[in-house]
Amino acid sequence: LLDKAERDGVETTYDRKQNFKAQCGFGLQGNCCRICGMGPCRITPKTPRGLCGADEHVIVGRNFARMVAGGTAALSDHARDIAHTMALASRNGNYTIKDESKLITLAKEWDVETEGRDIYDIAHEVADVALMEFGKPYGVARFLKNAPVKRQKVWKELGIEPRAIDREVATIMHSTHIGCTADIDSLIHMSLRTSLADGWAGSMIGTRFSDILFGTPTVRETEANLGVLEENKVNIILHGHEPSLSEMIVLASEDPELVELAKEVGAD
């Protein structure tokens, strides 16, 4: 593929890396700060603090915390989309409930009434509860109770139980802004809490809801990587792991009109 890219004149990440020659040494060490308008500031033996007074530990801590916030926002927004999708699911719609038993199990975990109710009514209420996990004003993430009790105790004692997902991201963003947190311990503390919001709130919602909507995965043989490409077929490659889009591409590929169109242009 790299040879083909070179022949076709397609620039790859390796080409761009080569063009960089030497990357910024301060950036590689993480002791360069460009968060506020007074900077950028870089730490050296002669200038051990930035203009705001932050030393290298605080600068690295702020940069790391913002990376955590960015990653949490990305994965959790994926979960938000899946929750929205389940809120719109319907029996005759494009998105339906594939794993009803997993939905019922989750509903009971969250104290959502299931007896005598239509499965889609249950799904919509569970979706609403999940969406509240992003901005609820009180309490901690619901999925924390699924962790081992010993681990829950550690999180509670350390004070890193995540609250609402969006709140943890916002806390990092404002705390790392100009004139705010300059204590490395506090920065690491909020980074840990936000990481747990990612893993035990956003990611858990995305995973459980994907199983409910699209079916719980089972072990099976399949093709991967370059093995999926065929000359005599229409090849559609999706970048990312958003199943709500992938499922609709699969649905569209089975549309008789589109299948006929593909055959007209030479596909098997």
Language-model features, listed with the residues they occupy:
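Metallocofactor- and cofactor-centric catalytic cores in central/energy metabolism, strongly enriched
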Residues: 1-268
